[in-house]
Curated annotation (Swiss-Prot):
Subcellular location field: Cytoplasm
Coiled-coil ranges per UniProt: none
Protein's gene: serS
Lineage: Bacteria, Pseudomonadati, Campylobacterota, Epsilonproteobacteria, Campylobacterales
Pfam families: Seryl_tRNA_N, tRNA-synt_2b
Protein's pathway: Aminoacyl-tRNA biosynthesis; selenocysteinyl-tRNA(Sec) biosynthesis; L-seryl-tRNA(Sec) from L-serine and tRNA(Sec): step 1/1
Protein name: Serine--tRNA ligase
The family this protein is said to belong to: Belongs to the class-II aminoacyl-tRNA synthetase family. Type-1 seryl-tRNA synthetase subfamily.
Protein role: Catalyzes the attachment of serine to tRNA(Ser). Is also able to aminoacylate tRNA(Sec) with serine, to form the misacylated tRNA L-seryl-tRNA(Sec), which will be further converted into selenocysteinyl-tRNA(Sec).
Length: 415
């Protein structure tokens, strides 16, 4: 959640920054109005409470002096009713403000490029040169079918479209990639954790998926439980509503989970293959840091994901996202896009974001430094999306006969 005090202090500046994310000015103006209404409600309550305190003192004096308290008692009783009404009004105004504020995205950093969508993102650099093939490279779904690694039709039979089943070497490679990624991240100082695949509403509100993106989530009927869209949600919320001692920071974690997304806004996009699935495997990085550490940790997380791709000999590039393409909770993001020769294009395989204190405010994650409690910064990023890594291996390591060479670093994981 954005800092409402910051918005009050300089509404126009914050409004201008949020407009770079495409936030409607009317929404921000409405937030300002709700905030003013809450301030008025608080003043009304405090005024009535002050009057009550004054009358209570008078009541004691009246009784001590033996004076008639009938009229004063009637005023006290009447004021109690007004206080209860004022407190209820204040609660309603507070809830209205907080609900609206939960729908406002994070403020982008000043150095985030201007732009409306992915076409305005800025390439930082390319890493490794794509291989030149002496034949026309095939796309991954053709290779997966030819080698018997992945069956999309059986995925549909078991569930619906955008599900798949892995067999034989395809399944073994997925398992090998998960272990390789976790080991790689652990060696970079990220502690491995294992978390639930179901979370409650508070966890999703903490990391920013709710209330805005509920249509993209799978919910358990009759319960306030949701399948996780990313490990970012449970891992970040491990420290929800806690005050951490400064010596514990930074906390750096890595986790493997299955992820579940309805992809409600992806109709017609990547309808074939494994690029966009309702269920997929991912290894995540999450860091919880002091504010002054977060930029350094951000660069470290980007480098970890890039080095992992390089270890797998997969050509990729780093891209800085523009304001219009930034995620809801991100203050800044660098995407890593892997080269897919079958598609003759770079495709996203990792997204590393610094949310600053945005998620920490929502999830109430703070740290104590001396006598002061402050909000931490939280960061997250894929390292890596397992299915898309498998896609990249199939396309980049394919041979003319359709067979696929396995990257050397995975050999120990495949006996």
């Amino acid at each position: 959640m954005i800092d409402l005090k910051l918005l009050q202090k300089d509404f126009q500046t914050i409004s201008n920054k949020l407009s770079r994310k495409g936030v409607d000015a009317d929404l921000l103006e409405n937030l300002k109005i709700r905030n003013e209404e809450l301030k008025v409600a608080k003043v009304a309550y405090e005024t009535l409470q002050a009057a009550q305190n004054s009358m209570s003192k008078d009541f004691g004096i009246y009784k001590k002096e033996g004076r008639d308290t009938t009229e004063l008692k009637a005023k006290v009783d009447e004021n109690k009713i007004k206080i209860a009404e004022a407190l209820d009004t204040q609660r309603i105004k507070q809830e209205a403000l907080e609900y609206l504020a939960m729908s406002i995205p994070n403020i982008p950093d000043d150095d985030v490029p201007d732009g409306k969508d992915e076409n305005d993102n800025v390439e930082i650099k390319k890493v490794l040169t794509p291989k030149e093939f002496s034949f026309t490279p095939k796309e991954h779904w053709e290779l997966a079918g030819q080698n018997g690694w992945i069956d999309f039709e059986r995925g549909v039979k078991l569930a619906t479209s955008r599900f798949s089943v892995s067999f034989g070497m395809g399944a073994k490679l997925e398992r090998a990639l998960i272990n390789f990624m976790l080991n790689f991240n652990s060696k970079r100082g990220f502690e491995e954790v294992s978390v639930p695949s179901l979370v409650n509403r508070a966890a999703l509100e903490g990391t920013g998926q709710l209330p805005k993106f509920e249509d993209d989530l799978y919910k358990i009927q009759g319960q306030e439980l949701f399948l996780i869209p990313t490990a970012e949600v449970p891992v970040t919320n491990l420290y929800q509503d806690e005050i951490l001692h400064v010596e514990r920071l930074p906390i750096k974690m890595t986790a493997y989970t299955s992820c579940f997304r309805k992809e409600a806004g992806a109709a017609g996009r990547d309808t074939r293959g494994m690029i966009r699935q309702h269920q997929f495997h991912k290894v995540e990085l999450v860091s919880i840091t002091k504010p002054q550490q977060s930029d350094e940790i951000f660069d470290e997380m980007v480098q970890t994901a890039s080095d992992l791709l390089s270890a797998l000999e997969l050509p990729h590039r780093l891209v800085r996202l523009c304001g219009g393409d930034l995620g809801f909770g991100a203050a800044k993001t660098v995407d890593l896009e892997v080269w897919l020769p079958g598609q003759n294009a770079y495709r996203e395989i990792s997204s590393v974001s610094n949310t600053r204190e945005f998620q920490a405010r929502r999830a109430k994650i703070r740290f104590k430094d001396g006598d002061k409690n402050s909000f931490v910064h939280t960061l997250n990023g894929s390292s890596l999306a397992v299915g898309r890594t498998l896609v990249a291996i199939m396309e980049n390591f394919q041979n003319e006969d359709g067979s696929i060479t396995i990257p050397k670093v995975l050999s120990p994981y495949l006996n």
